[in-house]
């Protein structure tokens, strides 16, 4: 087996990044990178194996290497509170000031653009990524191809692959819709890629390659696995975090019965980093969908917990079993008060799991504190109580492998929406909209543009059919007559 396919040797994102970069790769260049000596030695061996491969073999192995990389940036990577440096002044731990964050993002953007440029220039990479010049040149060629009276084969290929739409005076290159006006996939040039990847990465809680690809492939036609990996190699927060085992709060799936209607309730202790009067967090998880709810608590008294649970139950519905690792006495008291306050509700306590409780509670606490740290740093705030709802949304919209969908989809039956940024309108158009009237105008322009493209496509299809008929060498006299039966029919 080639050395670069051994999982232990592809654990460093630096190795993958250098292998994907064109040009000579010497051991000297590695000392420019933050890697260990063992990694540098591994890279030298990997490079030797890599150079022996043909171009087609490299393409074949590339996907395998990218799959191995999935473990390098774990899904939902979050920086642990304990790993954040202490800062001087009034900034809380883990909260960078705005100027430092802007400088870091600027450096990331510059490095990403350089890496993408090298990737595109690599002869072994069949690029879907446009330079800015190529992007606008393609728009021009697509428009010219549609306007030509007599079209070449290249014109037909262009028209079959791309469409151009105009919204508020801005022309955008999109994937040919073929009549599917409810699904638009945009093409972007490399100068636009970083902001799209960065915003998506943050919005899904520093999610890995698979989650980012799931988020982006529905709206963009040329955001590839390779460019996502290049971006992820630059995210310091993801690589500073030590991979931790996934916690298993939810029991193993069983055939459906009432016991499946279970919720998990934990009280997480935040007294060491209290946010004003809030010193605890209520962690709620639905067993079957893994949907979570986070709420700040002033105390861990049962009556305060019950008040929050009633809000949850009257919105999402009530489970049959309430499970908790916060103690049998606490669980029984909460269940008793729920049944007292809501006589029509009948809910029972979950089974006690000796030996498992502490690990499960610690897992939930670690997960939430990691999310809090990331949110505090991104928002320059130490008021974690205000951010719990946003952290909850990030976790619930993340793709879950065991569910094969996000917890939000499992709970509600559709994907989470974020206002107009979930619409088919271009991002830059959405950013300028202020009123419903402006939204209606933009949607009408998009609709009209799609209708025009659909009519043009129908005309091009008719022209292509006519051209095929003109090129048909079969004489008209040889066409079979229907009166001669089926024996004279020709098969095409």
UniProtKB/Swiss-Prot annotation:
Pfam families: KRAB
Coiled coil: 427-457
Region Disordered, residue ranges: 455-492
Modified residues (Phosphothreonine): 117
Transmembrane segments: none
Keywords: Coiled coil, Phosphoprotein
Segments forming domain Integrase catalytic: 247-415
Feature: compositional bias, Polar residues: 479-492
Protein name (Swiss-Prot/TrEMBL): KRAB-A domain-containing protein 2
Highest classification ranks of the organism: Eukaryota, Metazoa, Chordata, Craniata, Vertebrata
């Amino acid at each position: 087996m080639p050395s670069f396919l051994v999982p232990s040797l592809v654990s460093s994102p630096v190795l993958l990044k250098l292998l994907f970069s064109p040009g000579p790769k010497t051991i000297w260049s590695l000392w420019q990178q933050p890697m260990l000596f063992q990694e540098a030695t591994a890279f030298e061996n990997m490079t030797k194996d890599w150079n022996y491969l043909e171009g087609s073999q490299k393409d074949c192995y590339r996907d395998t290497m990218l799959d191995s990389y999935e473990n390098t940036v774990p899904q939902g990577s979050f920086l642990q509170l304990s790993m954040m440096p202490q800062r001087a002044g009034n900034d809380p731990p883990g909260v960078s000031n705005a100027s430092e964050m802007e400088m870091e993002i600027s450096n990331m953007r510059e490095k990403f653009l350089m890496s993408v440029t090298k990737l595109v220039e690599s002869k072994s990479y069949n690029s879907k990524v446009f330079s800015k010049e190529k992007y606008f040149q393609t728009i021009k060629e697509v428009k010219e191809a549609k306007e030509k009276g007599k079209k070449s084969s290249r014109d037909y290929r262009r028209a079959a692959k791309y469409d151009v739409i105009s919204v508020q005076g801005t022309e955008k290159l999109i994937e040919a819709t073929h009549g599917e006006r409810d699904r638009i996939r945009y093409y972007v040039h490399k100068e636009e890629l970083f902001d799209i990847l960065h915003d998506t990465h943050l919005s899904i809680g520093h999610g890995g390659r698979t989650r980012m690809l799931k988020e982006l492939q529905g709206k963009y036609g040329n955001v590839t696995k390779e460019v996502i990996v290049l971006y992820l190699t630059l995210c310091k927060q993801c690589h500073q975090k030590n991979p931790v085992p996934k916690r298993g709060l939810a029991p193993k799936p069983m055939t459906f019965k009432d016991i499946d209607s279970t919720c998990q309730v934990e009280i997480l202790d935040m007294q060491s980093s209290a946010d004003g009067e809030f010193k605890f967090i209520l962690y709620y998880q639905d067993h079957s969908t893994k949907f979570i709810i986070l709420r700040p608590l002033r105390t861990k008294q049962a009556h305060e917990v019950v008040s929050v649970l009633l809000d949850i139950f009257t919105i999402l519905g009530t489970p049959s079993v309430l499970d908790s690792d916060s103690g049998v006495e606490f669980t029984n008291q909460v269940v008793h008060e729920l049944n007292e306050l809501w006589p029509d509700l009948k809910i029972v306590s979950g089974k006690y799991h000796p030996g498992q409780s502490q690990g499960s509670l610690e897992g939930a606490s670690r997960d939430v504190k990691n999310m809090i740290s990331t949110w505090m740093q991104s928002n320059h705030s130490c008021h974690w109580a205000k951010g719990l709802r946003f952290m909850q949304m990030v976790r619930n919209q993340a793709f879950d492998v065991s569910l094969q969908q996000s917890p939000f989809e499992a709970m509600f039956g559709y994907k989470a929406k974020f206002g107009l940024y979930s619409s088919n309108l271009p991002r830059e158009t959405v950013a300028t909209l202020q009123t419903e009237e402006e939204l209606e105008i933009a949607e009408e322009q998009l609709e009209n543009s799609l209708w025009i493209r659909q009519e043009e496509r129908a005309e091009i299809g008719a022209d292509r059919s006519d051209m095929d008929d003109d090129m048909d060498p079969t004489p008209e006299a040889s066409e079979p007559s229907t009166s001669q039966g089926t024996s004279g029919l020709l098969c095409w």
